[in-house]
C-alpha cells in the first residue's frame, strides 16, 4: 500500500507561517482582506467557499463573500471587480470560476480586469507571464502551487526527475508544468490528443493528474516507486474522488495523495498565503 500524502499537515504548516505574517501586519494596523466574488449560488462553489472562509480565520485573514445574481451581466461583474481594484482595504480577490454559461465568452476579459497585485489565484495575463518567465510579482494559480508545496513538505525533490502532467488547463496543468520546470524537472504534458498516455506515465517518477475524469489513471498507467498527485475533484455518484482508480493505483505506487484530503486541502492555505503576501506588498509593510 502506498504512503498517503495527506494535505492537512501541509496546510497546517503553511497556515501557521501565514498567521505569523498576518499578525505582524495586524500589529501595524493592516488587516489582510480577501474578497471571494461569485455569480449565482451553486453548491460546488459553496463547498469551496466554506473551506476558504474557515482557512482564512485560521490564518488571520478577513474573508468577505460578495455574491452577484446568477444572471448578472458582464458589466455588473466588471463593476464588482473595479470596486475591488479601487478599495485599498482589499488585498486579494478570487473570482469563482467557471462563470455562468452566458459569461463564458467574457471570462478572460473579466479576469484580466483585476489589478494584478490583487490577483491571488493567478488569473490575470500578468500573473501567467510571471509563472511562465519566473520573473515579476505574479502569483501562480493556487492549485498548481499547492502541488509544489506538498512535494516540498514531504521532501520530494523534483530536480532531475521526470514528471508527467495529465491535463493542460491554465489553472493546473500548464502552470504546474512551468513550476516543475523551474525546479529543474523534465516535464511531459499529456492531454486528450495524446495517443498513449499510459506509455508515458509508466516512465515517470512523478505523476500529476488533473484530467477531471473518474478512473482515468489506472493500474496500467503506473509502476512501483512512483509519486502520484491526484488534483481532480470528481463526483462518482456516491462521493468525491480523483482521477485515479485509488485501490488499484495505491497498491502499486510508492506514494499518492488521497481525494478528498490531498492537494485540494492545501489550495485554500496557499490562497491565504498569497493574500497576506499581497497585503505586505500593497501596504509596504512586509517583504512579500
Predicted regions and their residues:
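Glycine-rich phosphate/diphosphate-binding loop of Rossmann-like nucleotide-binding domains
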Residues: 39-53, 137-227, 231, 239-247
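N-terminal glycine-rich anion-binding loops that anchor highly charged ligand groups
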Residues: 24-34, 40-58
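Rossmann-fold NAD(P)-binding glycine/threonine-rich loop
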Residues: 108-129, 230-283
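Short beta-strand elements in bilobed, periplasmic/extracellular small-molecule ligand-binding domains
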Residues: 56-70, 187-189
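Anion-binding alpha/beta catalytic cores of soluble intermediary-metabolism enzymes, centered on
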Residues: 92-158, 215
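Short beta-strand segments
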Residues: 38, 94-98, 166
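Short, well-structured alpha-helical segments in soluble
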Residues: 76-88
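Positively charged, low-complexity intrinsically disordered leader regions
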Residues: 1-30
Amino acid at each position: 500500500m502506498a504512503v498517503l500524502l495527506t494535505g492537512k499537515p501541509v496546510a497546517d504548516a503553511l497556515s501557521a507561517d501565514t498567521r505569523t505574517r498576518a499578525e505582524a501586519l495586524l500589529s501595524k494596523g493592516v488587516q489582510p482582506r480577501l474578497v471571494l466574488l461569485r455569480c449565482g449560488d451553486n453548491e460546488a462553489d459553496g463547498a469551496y467557499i466554506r473551506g476558504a472562509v474557515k482557512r482564512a480565520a485560521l490564518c488571520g485573514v478577513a474573508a468577505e463573500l460578495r455574491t452577484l445574481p446568477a444572471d448578472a451581466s458582464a458589466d455588473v461583474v466588471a463593476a464588482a471587480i473595479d470596486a475591488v481594484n479601487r478599495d485599498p482595504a482589499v488585498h486579494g480577490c478570487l473570482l469563482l470560476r467557471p462563470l455562468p454559461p452566458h459569461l463564458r465568452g467574457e471570462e478572460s476579459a473579466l479576469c484580466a480586469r483585476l489589478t494584478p497585485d490583487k490577483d491571488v489565484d493567478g488569473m490575470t495575463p500578468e500573473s501567467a507571464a510571471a509563472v511562465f518567465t519566473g520573473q515579476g510579482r505574479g502569483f501562480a494559480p493556487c492549485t498548481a502551487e499547492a502541488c509544489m508545496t506538498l512535494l516540498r513538505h514531504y521532501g520530494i525533490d523534483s530536480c532531475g526527475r521526470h514528471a508527467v502532467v495529465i491535463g493542460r488547463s491554465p489553472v493546473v496543468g500548464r502552470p504546474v508544468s512551468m513550476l516543475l520546470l523551474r525546479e529543474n524537472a523534465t516535464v511531459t504534458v499529456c492531454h486528450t490528443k495524446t495517443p498513449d498516455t499510459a506509455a508515458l506515465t509508466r516512465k515517470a517518477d512523478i505523476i500529476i493528474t488533473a484530467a477531471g475524469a473518474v478512473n482515468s489513471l489506472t493500474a496500467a498507467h503506473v509502476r512501483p516507486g512512483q509519486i502520484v498527485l491526484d488534483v481532480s475533484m470528481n463526483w462518482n455518484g456516491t462521493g468525491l474522488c480523483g482521477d485515479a482508480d485509488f485501490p488499484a493505483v495505491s497498491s502499486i505506487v510508492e506514494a499518492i495523495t488521497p481525494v478528498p484530503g490531498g492537494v485540494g486541502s492545501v489550495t485554500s492555505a496557499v490562497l491565504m498565503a498569497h493574500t497576506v503576501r499581497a497585503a505586505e506588498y500593497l501596504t509596504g509593510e512586509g517583504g512579500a
